[in-house]
Curated annotation (Swiss-Prot):
Record keywords: ATP-binding, Coenzyme A biosynthesis, Cytoplasm, Kinase, Nucleotide-binding, Transferase
Organism: Listeria monocytogenes serotype 4a (strain HCC23)
UniProt protein name: Pantothenate kinase
Metabolic or biological pathway, per its Swiss-Prot or TrEMBL entry: Cofactor biosynthesis; coenzyme A biosynthesis; CoA from (R)-pantothenate: step 1/5
Gene3D superfamilies per record: P-loop containing nucleotide triphosphate hydrolases (3.40.50.300)
Length: 306
């Protein structure tokens, strides 16, 4: 399915011509600090793609604030607006985490830090490994059934109910498991929620996560490119983070490169690739905006819902 009929299509060359002040641009040092492993996002992308997008999000944010104010005045109520929630979805290894960090830094810059912007990843809403093992679904980690959807729904409900302090579970990619500790966000204005599952919908639930989102983005690329990036990232991690004996994946530094490649390909072909085709990719057309990356990691096309 390639249903972009209800989207405006902007090739990169057209999108980059949208007018926006360059005052909000990041420095090379700031970008380097937030760039993910094997993510080749550049200052050119920041200037040509993300600045116009941040302005668009700011327009949506101000519109939401205005409409809420008008409604409260009409209803003679004095309730502040719930946080503006931005969802960011896409496959493993497509660059979601870096993009989410870019969003946060640029929104902080755009609003001159007069708005509290928080970043949340849905990894913390996975069931702990112990639970996944007990249920026999450790090999389905990242699939819809591996997430504590009730906990995620409560988190979203608390946000939209203007609860003053909202608790967020934390996840470690080092130990490959949910941590015991949590963090609390206090009265945020804008919340960016990043994860492969944020646009998924369970037909048996009364509420869909998308019911809570004010703006949603899907990071897209051809599967062959994502698979290649996944393998490149795996081998980079094998030479760095996996070398620590406490890492969940440390054993894969002790086998040959060919054996490690066989393992990584197996993970893609039986888990990540399957999850992409069966669960993640089909959520693309639920997004308000789709960013499509080319083989070179650069965003080539932008699709904005009409």
């Amino acid at each position: 399915m390639n249903d972009y009929n209800h989207y405006f299509h902007f090739p990169r060359e057209e999108w980059r011509k949208l007018e926006v002040s360059k005052d909000q641009i990041l420095t090379a040092e700031e970008l380097e600090e937030i760039r993910g492993l094997n993510d080749r996002i550049s200052l050119q992308d920041i200037s040509e793609i993300y600045l116009p997008l941040i302005k668009l999000i700011a327009i949506q944010y101000h519109e939401a604030i205005f409409i809420h104010g008008e409604k409260m005045e009409y209803l003679k109520k004095k309730e502040s607006r719930a946080p503006f929630i931005i969802a960011l979805a896409g496959s493993v290894a497509v660059g979601k985490s870096t993009t989410a960090r870019v969003f946060k830094l640029m929104l902080d810059r755009w609003f001159s830090k007069t708005r509290q912007v928080e970043l949340v990843t849905t990894d913390g809403f996975l069931y702990p490994n112990k639970v996944l093992e007990e249920r026999g679904i450790m090999d389905k980690k990242g699939f819809p059934e591996s997430y504590d959807r009730d906990r995620f729904a409560k988190f979203l409900t608390d946000l939209k109910a203007n609860k003053e302090d909202v608790e967020i579970p934390l996840y470690s990619h080092f130990t490959y498991d949910v941590l015991d500790e949590t963090r609390v966000i206090h009265n945020p204005d804008i919340v960016i929620i990043e994860g492969i599952n944020v646009l998924q919908a369970d037909q048996h639930e009364s509420l869909f996560p998308s019911d809570f989102f004010d703006f949603s983005v899907y990071m897209d690329a051809n599967e062959s490119d994502i698979k290649k990036w996944y393998l490149e990232r795996f081998f980079m991690l094998r030479e760095t983070a996996f070398q620590d004996e406490s890492s969940y994946f440390h054993p894969y530094t002790k086998i040959s490169k060919q054996e490690a490649e066989t393992f990584a390909l197996g993970v893609w072909d039986t888990i990540n690739g399957v999850n992409l085709k069966e669960n993640i990719e089909k959520t693309k057309y639920r997004a308000d905006l789709v960013l499509h990356k080319g083989t070179d990691h650069l965003i080539s096309d932008i699709y904005l819902r009409k």
